[in-house]
From Swiss-Prot:
<keyword id="KW-0539">Nucleus</keyword>
<dbReference type="InterPro" id="IPR014001">
    <property type="entry name" value="Helicase_ATP-bd"/>
</dbReference>
<comment type="similarity">
    <text>Belongs to the helicase family. SKI2 subfamily.</text>
</comment>
<dbReference type="GO" id="GO:0005737">
    <property type="term" value="C:cytoplasm"/>
</dbReference>
<feature type="domain" description="Helicase ATP-binding">
    <location>
        <begin position="826"/>
        <end position="999"/>
    </location>
</feature>
<dbReference type="Pfam" id="PF00271">
    <property type="entry name" value="Helicase_C"/>
</dbReference>
<feature type="compositionally biased region" description="Low complexity">
    <location>
        <begin position="581"/>
        <end position="603"/>
    </location>
</feature>
<keyword id="KW-0547">Nucleotide-binding</keyword>
<feature type="binding site">
    <location>
        <begin position="839"/>
        <end position="846"/>
    </location>
    <ligand>
        <name>ATP</name>
    </ligand>
</feature>
<dbReference type="GO" id="GO:0004386">
    <property type="term" value="F:helicase activity"/>
</dbReference>
<feature type="region of interest" description="Disordered">
    <location>
        <begin position="338"/>
        <end position="357"/>
    </location>
</feature>
<feature type="compositionally biased region" description="Acidic residues">
    <location>
        <begin position="1445"/>
        <end position="1454"/>
    </location>
</feature>
<keyword id="KW-0067">ATP-binding</keyword>
<dbReference type="GO" id="GO:0005524">
    <property type="term" value="F:ATP binding"/>
</dbReference>
<feature type="compositionally biased region" description="Low complexity">
    <location>
        <begin position="1456"/>
        <end position="1487"/>
    </location>
</feature>
<dbReference type="InterPro" id="IPR052431">
    <property type="entry name" value="SKI2_subfamily_helicases"/>
</dbReference>
<dbReference type="InterPro" id="IPR027417">
    <property type="entry name" value="P-loop_NTPase"/>
</dbReference>
Length: 1816
């Protein structure tokens, strides 16, 4: 196989995506597949995935294999996946064992399969969300069994190990793994690699691979017959060899399977197996193996934690011995399995050998490290007699070893000599190692490990102690006694009071609304800017709302006090009136007289009446004249469907009905006669006789039946009658007299009977108006398919079903009647309560936001409501909506000039009225900035409501943590809106738990106002080369999606709904397949029998009940065969496995087909930005080419030549010509004619050139707009996007190709949502959001969802799956903690408003005081400890509970300032050491008595919100874990000199950290480079200086790694390596970080007692419970191991300090992130994202940022650097902002320093280059 030359590599056939969270993109509830062999190989090669510079190559080693350690990692991995609430299967292919190259791995694999798959226990993991499967398949020959398995289970992806490491080739056949991946990709769309997998909090992150463009062409290079033959030959050879060895082994050792079990049966067998075929090896190894078996059984797992130095070289003979032992054990276990299978098949249960029982599988089967330890002791001490051997291992150990040895000799009859042959031992020396050096190294390493300092630095103040009391108390015993001293270098307190983009200081009252003196100076300039901004949104706003409905607020609602005064005033007035009855009566009389006089003088009323009467007469004459001209059904219905004139001109309506009936009767008669004549004429011509030919009565009836109205016309007549009946009966309007109603009823009866053919409707009309006409039955209405009106409504008139949503009039809402659930929401807002609202898209949930806005605007001028959007597009839309709905006149309300603004916007690139607005529209990242800003006291206190739109974004792997932090940190009432929440109850409970004193209601409304119809596009291939493929849009019945499995059916999802037509179709299939008797109760006539007026007035709610009953009946069917019959009958024959095709090349024809079917306007969703743009361009080009006349092209050329010659002939005289000059006019005429030739009428829409904004016309996609085609994605210009949204809403364009940017809340109503092709980003959540854009309320009766080019299985999963559960996030990080501490420090010390200069003076004074205080330091420390103890008591009593009320917080804060001797630090720092903690008399916190009430309230809010943040993680159930993360972050900040010992924030580049917090961890890395002096000696040449800075930053920010598929391309530009000094600084920073975090992790694991969970699932299945002990060695191990433990005490780490996994693996010192991730454990959820760890040793980094600065060209970045065009603007813009932030922070610290000047210069120049290349 390896000799086959491959021209391609695996990466050429698959394309990788960026690393992202597979759970959020595929969906946590989507089942996926794990390749079991890949998992085994991954665990044995995981460290090879890390940097090649890491010394520890592997996590697990076959040479030093410990099987129990493998299963620890194996089960921990499974537990980690399960803890993310996933569903998956792990499968093994039995035949793959022969492709392993290592016998130990084969043995591990065998144990794994026996334990987890062949175990007699059912599901040993006791978890239904994971299943193990073993498949027997020679898949290279026949893939059908695996294909069936994949198709049956519909896995979303497979997790597999790519053969990218050397260790893989060492263990497994690389080429076979590659072929297996490709074969699997034939039936799976995506594979996910093990190589990059990482558990980050609630996320599982890795790289996803899809099929590349070369997949189909390259597949044969890998998967060819010749190659498969070689695989088969290799397999057969390995299989035969193994089978031969197995049979030989069985023949020679039949006694193994027949002997009765002895006391030490397991060990005897193991020893026998190991010794049997090793005669050529020294018998010493057999004896050592015997001792090893006894110790393996006797020692606890924790007592086997030896350190085996990497310098120890294992003898080749030993390796062969152990490898051979593994192989013989594999043969033995295989024989046991075969025997068990044979016994089971023969029902023979007489086998007494427990080893044959798969329940007793021993996971602790191998421990080669223990064997090497025994070997080393034997070889170094060379025992000469039994006493010496006993002194090494203990007498009891040797006795047991001899017993096993002798039993083997006796029981099995093998002559293996004597055990105590000490001549062999004494001559057994190690010639590869200096064993004394090895022992010394082991002792040194053990001593070093046991002396690891696990102490921590508890940086504390009142804030820290109060927000994390539990963790603080638990960490106290581990607190370091000696905090490091350092030289003073930092003497300035950090105050984050400036904007990230400007050095301008933020005023303390920035968020208070006051009219400042500077307002008058800057008002005009500022107003002009704001007017310009508002003006740009005017057209956008008008497309969202009718500008005539704008609400102008000129006054505020009265306050409670004002209402009370008004009530008292009214009571006084009423009491005065009661004493003046006479005057009151005379007044009443006078009023009556006046009224009479007034009424008699209203002359205009009669004139209006005459005018109305005149118009009515004109209308009557016009309609009467039109009646005579009516020649079609459409013309009759146009008048009859309009009931506006019914009360005024009922006779005219009756005339129209009569004419309509007569018209149809005559039309039918004429058609019958014409058809008769035609038939008779044909027969005459065919007949040769002249006899008279007549039609039979049957033939005449057939002709009459064939000429009945079509179903479309019948539906129109039915809906017309339905409208009249509802007006006359259900609406109970007394608009017509009874006589007139009877006249109308007679016409209705005739139409229902003769035209529509519904007997029950005719009988209803007859009975209701007592017409006394004959009762009809089905035979009286002709040969009709439908004979009752109920089925007719369901099947042919579902659009007119009553949509009764419980709407009622409510004075609080303008312009519409709110539904019942919306009224409940109004009440919640009026009470200032919170709510979680989950309602389907287009149901109208956003209305509550506008009610909230209106209430706040009317209530006061100071209150703020914040609207949080997930995207900037939604921010723009909401801003425009507010502008279009409201206007508030603050000057009229205040009676003076005002600084207030109604609405503001805050995004990273657009800021407007943030400080002065009442409605703030923002994104979550910017709201967090406001929450954490030290200047936001007034802002938070003014917040009345916060509205979180699309709150399911909390599940996002990108910014989900920010959403969660905002929800937890928010102190105000809130509304959380979403249409797609899976675990709704869990999420609601989480929101309630945040603040138990805050009521959070749940509003769950599942119904859609407009239902969705599902379709799929079917391609019919071309018949020959001359023809083209055709496309049909076929309806997709929801029940067809149940056919997900090849051999079965899936269950019905709760979200699967049937609309009316689908419900009646299902009933008819059930009746046909099962018989009417079984389903008669589901007969619509019977089911709806008790519904009043059912013949014309069914409601949508009735259908929902009916479809639920149908689904329940189907679910309860006992027979799978019956279910399959039903599903098959409801499935279109075209809905098969051939739905995937090359749709992109046919996109124009597809769009035209939708236009033909009247399915436009439509949103075409594709989740690739570049593809969206290309599709829009392609359709535009095709349409332009098709609609352009070739003759016009020639005419254009001729006209261009004429114009050019004409202009040349005029020459310079042209400029002097008058406008009315004939020559000038002729030239203008020619130009106008030329311009007219360029105009093409839009194919999709109706827009003019003026509809396209001037700013947009230069956009590359602008020409496509002229044909009604657009693209919409995050890479587009914002002006273009805004224009597209406006044009689409206005129906001026009808085709938009979009990513999910239009799926999240943007108002883009469409008739259809079209999914183009598959994508890993297309999951259930995304599909529901995208589909919800179709059929918006008030626009369409139905929404259409069309699937194009998606596999059937994917469509099934999207339509018949429940929404994924929200998992949650890790919410704490060092950057966040620094912001929290900075804000607290400013709130408690900001009342003095000290500037930085004042702080510097204060610190210098403190330094002078320090010398005087040194003598008193010890006494103060004692005093401090005493007070801290008092604090601890208080914490125990008060702080443990999460739900503290506001009063408790206030008392607690006030008390703390009285009792705690808070001190300010005299900070002393160096590069890598924390601040000194010497104290002075100067207080660090100001007494609350000295603070303002606003500052006190701010402190209370901050503490309460931070407590909530640390105690209410949606993902982490245990709040202590979050508190540990918080205190670790504080410790880290102290060690890195961002905080002092008393938790005072220091200005040590802290501004860069906080303002670049969203780029964590690289904000900290950059600061470490600054402090390390990387930029101290910059090149003097400006260009070289700029290149150096950008080179360094390109490794940290906006990094684009180069996938392996591109590395081979010479056109890719790779960044040069970082300088060694940079590497060293980063490494030192990483080492300090990991050391600190390891300590906290160690303490937390100690708290969890995690050694009990060494095997998360199988702890109780270990052979010896003693092996899981958590106490000390002397207390747990038996006496037989005392000697061993005594001799080896110096050679193994203390079991007290480390858990079992650490002891066995030898990972004691965490040197890299990969190691850290492997020791986290399955019961800890620490995300490594919270660590400011920077790894720059990974894959090559794209140099596009540096390249752009060098050549300033976009094209090379796209073509050479392979940066997507749609991403380029975003990346370069982001990098420009980063440069600006850094330059601002450095300039603020020291504007004249060379570093500040260098960064300011490069930032300015980079931004200029960016602006020159990008217009937007």
């Amino acid at each position: 196989m390896e000799n086959i030359e491959k021209k391609l590599m695996l990466g050429d056939l698959l394309f990788p995506t960026k690393t992202f969270n597979v759970l959020s993109d595929f969906g946590a509830d989507e089942p996926f597949l794990i390749d079991g062999d890949s998992l085994i190989l991954y665990l044995f090669s995981t460290f090879n995935i890390s940097s090649h510079k890491i010394k520890d190559k592997q996590l697990l080693s076959t040479d030093k294999c410990q099987s129990i350690l493998f299963f620890h990692y194996f089960e921990s991995f499974i537990a980690n996946v399960l803890n993310r609430k996933t569903k998956f299967q792990i499968f093994f292919i039995d035949e793959n064992q022969y492709f392993y190259k290592n016998n130990t791995l084969k043995l591990i694999r065998k144990i794994c399969i026996d334990y987890y798959i062949n175990n007699d226990k059912k599901n040993v993991l006791n978890n239904s969300n994971v299943q193990f499967t073993l498949i027997k398949s020679k898949w290279w020959e026949d893939f059908s069994s695996i294909e069936s398995y994949l198709l049956e289970n519909m896995f979303s992806f497979m997790l597999v190990l790519f053969p990218a490491q050397e260790s893989f080739e060492k263990y497994y056949r690389v080429d076979i793994q590659e072929v297996f991946i490709l074969k699997t990709m034939k039936f799976l769309d995506y594979v996910v690699e093990f190589n990059s997998i990482s558990f980050e909090g609630s996320c599982i992150e890795t790289i996803i691979y899809g099929k590349g463009t070369m997949f189909q062409r390259g597949y044969p290079y890998f998967c060819n017959k010749e190659f498969f033959k070689q695989i088969d030959s290799f397999y057969n050879n390995e299989f035969e060899n193994f089978n031969s060895d197995k049979l030989s082994f069985k023949d020679q050792n039949q006694i193994l399977f027949n002997q009765q079990q002895s006391e030490n049966r397991d060990n005897e067998i193991n020893l026998l197996i190991s010794t049997m075929f090793n005669n050529d090896i020294s018998n010493n190894l057999n004896r050592i193996y015997c001792i090893y078996l006894v110790l393996l059984e006797s020692l606890s797992i924790r007592d086997r934690g030896f350190i085996l130095p990497t310098c120890y070289k294992i003898d080749e003979n030993v390796l062969n011995f152990l490898d051979n032992a593994s192989y013989k054990n594999l043969l033995y276990l295989q024989q046991v399995s075969d025997s068990s299978s044979s016994s089971s098949n023969n029902n023979n249960n007489n086998n007494n050998n427990n080893n044959n029982n798969n329940e007793n599988i021993n996971l602790d089967y191998l421990d080669f490290k223990l064997f090497y330890q025994i070997l080393i002791q034997i070889q170094i001490k060379l025992p000469k007699d039994l006493n010496e051997l006993n002194n090494i291992f203990g007498e009891e150990i040797i006795i047991k070893s001899k017993l096993i040895w002798n039993n083997v000799k006796k029981d099995f009859g093998y002559d293996i000599g004597e055990f105590d042959n000490f001549e062999l031992f004494s001559n057994f020396q190690d010639r590869n190692n200096n064993l004394n050096d090895i022992i010394q190294e082991m002792e040194r390493r053990t001593k070093e490990i046991n002396s690891i300092d696990n102490s921590i630095y508890l940086v504390e103040n009142d804030f820290i102690r109060s927000v994390a009391p539990q963790a603080y108390e638990y960490l106290k015993p581990f607190q370091s006694e000696n905090y490091p001293d350092a030289e003073s270098t930092i003497n300035t307190r950090f105050i984050d009071n400036y904007h990230f983009h400007s050095t301008r200081t933020i005023e303390p009252d920035a968020f208070s609304i006051k009219l400042k003196e500077t307002t008058f100076k800057t008002k005009k300039h500022k107003q002009r800017a704001e007017d310009k901004s508002v003006g740009s949104f005017k057209k956008y706003a008008d497309s969202l709302n009718d500008p005539r409905n704008i609400l102008i607020i000129n006054k505020l609602n009265p306050t409670k006090e004002e209402l009370e005064k008004e009530r008292i005033k009214k009571e006084k007035e009423d009491s005065k009136k009661s004493y003046k009855k006479q005057s009151s009566s005379s007044s009443s009389s006078s009023t009556t007289t006046t009224s009479t006089t007034t009424s008699s003088t209203i002359k205009p009323k009669s004139e209006i009446g005459k005018l109305l009467e005149s118009r009515l007469n004109q209308d009557k004459k016009r309609y009467e004249s039109e009646l005579d001209d009516c020649k079609s059904i459409k013309s009759f219905l146009k008048f009859l469907n309009n009931l506006d004139l019914l009360t005024s001109l009922p006779e005219l309506y009756l005339q129209y009905f009569d004419h309509l009936i007569n018209f149809l009767v005559k039309q039918k008669e004429d058609l019958i006669e014409e058809k008769k004549r035609t038939i008779l004429l044909e027969r005459k011509q065919q007949s040769k006789t002249k006899t008279h030919i007549e039609l039979s009565e049957y033939e005449e009836k057939e002709i009459e039946t064939s000429l009945e109205l079509g179903i479309k016309e019948k539906s129109q007549f039915y809906q017309m009658i339905q409208k009249y009946l509802r007006s006359f009966i259900t609406e109970k309007s007394k608009i017509l007299s009874t006589k007139l109603q009877i006249d109308f009823a007679n016409r209705f009866y005739t139409i229902s009977k003769s035209l529509i053919g519904l007997s029950d409707l005719s009988n209803f009309i007859n009975d209701h108006w007592k017409l006394k006409l004959p009762k009809l039955d089905e035979s009286d209405v002709g040969n009709q398919q439908l004979k009752n009106s109920i089925e007719f409504q369901l099947k042919h008139s579902p659009d007119t079903l009553i949509r009764n949503t419980g709407s009622v009039e409510d004075s609080r809402v303008r312009h519409f009647k709110p539904d019942a659930w919306q009224v409940e929401l109004l009440d919640i807002v009026d009470k200032r309560e919170s709510a979680l609202i989950c309602a389907s898209t287009s149901s109208g949930k956003t209305f509550i936001s506008f009610y909230c806005f209106e209430q706040i605007l009317k209530e006061s001028n100071d209150g703020i409501v914040v609207f949080v959007c997930p995207t900037k597009a939604l921010v723009n839309q909401m801003y425009a909506e507010v502008l279009g709905r409201y206007d508030k006149n603050y000057q009229a309300i205040n009676h003076r000039p005002s600084n207030h603004k109604m609405v503001g916007v805050f995004t990273r690139d657009f800021r407007l009225n943030i400080e002065t607005c009442q409605i703030l529209i923002t994104v979550p990242q910017c709201l967090e900035i406001l929450f954490l800003s030290i200047m936001n006291t007034h802002f938070i206190q003014r917040c009345r409501y916060i509205i979180f739109d699309e709150v399911h974004q909390i599940a996002s792997s990108v910014d989900g943590a920010i959403w969660e932090r905002l929800l937890v940190f928010n102190p105000a009432p809130f509304l959380a809106l979403s249409a797609t929440l899976g675990n709704l109850t869990d999420f609601h409970n989480f929101l309630k738990k945040i603040d138990p004193n805050r009521k959070v209601s749940l509003i769950h409304y599942q119904s859609r106002f407009n239902d969705l119809k599902n379709f799929f596009l079917c391609q019919t291939p071309a018949k020959d080369n001359k023809s083209f493929p055709t496309y049909t849009i076929e309806p997709l019945h929801p029940m067809a999606t149940l056919d997900q499995k090849k051999t079965g059916l899936s269950d019905i999802s709760p979200d699967l709904k049937l609309i009316a037509g689908e419900a009646i179709q299902m009933y008819q299939v059930l009746k046909e397949k099962l018989g009417y008797e079984k389903v008669n109760h589901l007969d619509p006539v019977k089911f709806f029998a008790n519904i009043p007026n059912k013949q014309f007035n069914l409601e949508k709610q009735h259908i929902e009940i009916y479809q639920a009953e149908l689904k329940q009946f189907y679910t309860n069917l006992p027979s799978m065969t019956e279910k399959q019959l039903v599903v098959k009958a409801l499935t279109s024959p075209k809905y098969n496995d051939s739905l995937k095709f090359d749709w992109a090349s046919e996109i124009t024809n597809i769009v035209l087909e939708l236009q033909k079917q009247d399915l436009l306007p439509a949103l075409f969703f594709s989740f690739n930005r570049s593809l969206c743009s290309r599709l829009a361009q392609r359709v535009y080009n095709d349409i332009t080419h098709r609609n352009t006349n070739p003759n016009i092209i020639e005419e254009k050329k001729q006209l261009d030549l004429v114009i050019e010659r004409f202009q040349k002939s005029l020459g310079r005289a042209l400029a002097d010509l008058e406008p009315n000059d004939p020559e000038k006019m002729e030239l203008e005429r020619l130009k106008a004619k030329r311009a007219s030739l360029d105009y093409l009428k839009p194919q999709f829409g109706n827009l003019l050139s003026s509809d396209i904004d001037e700013k947009v016309k230069k956009d590359p996609l602008a020409p496509a707009l002229t044909q009604g085609i657009a693209a919409h994605h995050g890479g587009c210009d914002k002006n273009y996007l805004r224009n597209v949204e406006y044009l689409f809403r206005s129906k001026k364009i009808q085709v938009v190709f979009a990513t999910s940017t239009l799926a999240v809340g943007v108002n883009a109503p469409a008739k259809s949502s079209v999914f183009l092709g598959d994508s890993p980003y297309l999951n259930v959540l995304t599909s529901k959001q995208c589909a919800g854009r179709a059929g918006r309320r008030g626009f369409d009766n139905y929404g259409n969802v069309i699937f194009v080019g998606l596999p059937k299985q994917k469509i099934n999963r999207l339509l018949n799956s429940r929404l994924s559960n929200i998992i949650g996030n890790s919410v704490v990080s060092p950057s966040l903690c620094l912001s929290l501490v900075s804000r607290y420090d400013y709130s408690t010390n900001g009342s003095a408003n000290k500037s930085n200069e004042e702080n510097k003076v204060q610190v210098k004074e403190n330094e002078k005081e320090r010398e005087k205080e040194k003598e008193k330091e010890k006494e103060k420390e004692k005093e401090k400890e005493t007070i801290a103890d008092n604090w601890d008591d208080d914490d125990d009593k008060k702080e443990i509970t999460v739900a503290d009320n506001w009063d408790d917080d206030e008392e607690e804060t006030a008390e703390s300032t009285k009792t705690t001797p808070a001190t300010t630090p005299t900070t002393t720092t160096t590069e890598n050491t924390p601040a000194t903690t010497t104290t002075t008399k100067t207080p660090t916190t100001t007494s609350l008595k000295k603070l303002s009430s606003e500052d006190i309230l701010d402190v209370q809010i901050l503490k309460k919100s931070t407590k909530s943040l640390l105690n209410n993680s949606f993902f982490l159930g245990n709040p202590l874990q979050v508190q540990f993360q918080f205190l670790f972050s504080i410790d880290y900040l102290y060690r890195e000199t961002y905080l002092s010992k008393d938790c005072v924030p220091m200005d040590n580049f802290s501004g860069i950290v906080t303002h670049l917090s969203y780029l964590e961890p690289f904000n900290f890395t950059f600061v470490s480079l600054l402090k390390g002096g990387v930029f101290d000696n910059l090149p003097t040449n400006q260009k070289d200086c700029d290149y150096f800075i950008i080179h360094i930053l390109s490794y940290l920010f906006c990094v684009q790694n180069i996938p392996s598929i591109y590395v081979r391309s010479p056109s890719i530009l790779i960044l040069p390596p970082l300088p060694p000094t940079v590497h060293k600084i980063i490494k030192n920073h990483n080492d300090r970080l990991l050391k600190t975090f390891s300590t906290y992790l160690y303490v937390y694991k100690k708290y969890l007692k995690s050694t009990n969970d060494f095997l998360p699932f199988s702890s109780n299945d270990l052979k010896d419970s003693q092996k899981t002990t958590t106490t000390t060695t002397t207390a747990t191990t038996s006496t037989i191991t005392n000697k061993w433990n005594e001799n080896f005490e110096k050679l193994k780490p203390s079991t007290e300090n480390f858990n079992t996994g650490d002891l066995l693996s030898g990972i004691f010192k965490v040197s890299n992130l990969k190691k850290l991730k492997n020791i986290l454990g399955s019961n800890t959820y620490f995300s490594t994202r919270i660590l400011p760890y920077c790894n720059v040793d990974g894959s090559p980094v794209n140099s596009y940022l540096l390249d752009f600065y060098k050549h300033s060209q976009k094209k090379p970045l796209i073509e050479d650097n392979k940066i997507k065009e749609s991403d380029l603007w975003t990346l370069l813009k982001e990098f420009s902002l980063i440069l600006k932030v850094i330059a601002t922070a450095l300039t603020r610290r020291n504007p004249d320093s060379p570093i500040s000047l260098a960064f300011s210069g490069v930032a300015k120049r980079y931004i200029q280059k960016f602006s020159d290349n990008f217009d937007h």
